[in-house]
Amino acid sequence: PNIELTKLQSETLKIPQITSTLNSDESSEEMIVLKTLLEKAKFDFKIDGLVHGGISSEFQKRSFEKICKESNLNTIAPLWKINSKEYMNSLLNSNFKFILTSVSSDGLDETWLGKIISMDDVSLLNKLSSKYGFNLNFEGGEAETFVTDCPLYLHPIKINKSQTVWDGYRGRFEIEDASLDSNAR
């Protein structure tokens, strides 16, 4: 959910965003579109590599490496195989503020949706992860996150209007309106 809000993240990071619409769930189609976008970024912005946030998905890592090799681009995966709890704690220690925008695992209920995650929450999530078997950093899709603020942002993202959708097992926090909070810094 909330993929359209990456535009605000791009804006506050002062990094250009290149997007495409994909009407398929086929990973082969995704890879073709990704390669096209990387080629465009290479040409338009003179990039020489891709930094991705993959932590444990071998498929994701191999896919990025293959596309980048074909496009003569470097790949960097600084979070690769990082310990989940260490990763979550490092985000908070580095002043990242993020919320959960979807949950779809036992142990994660609607109270997590839209919640700004704290150190206490990471401790609780770690316990729930052990009990219910989900990945603490949500690498398996058990939850999705959205960064509302971090040291690289010029302005935090303010959520003005949202709605929670819950079906009894999984849910989404749909951000209906958001803006850059230019008064916050």
Q: What are these model-derived regions, one by one?
A:
Residues 1-185:
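Nucleotide-activated chemistry modules centered on ATP-dependent adenylation/adenylyltransferase
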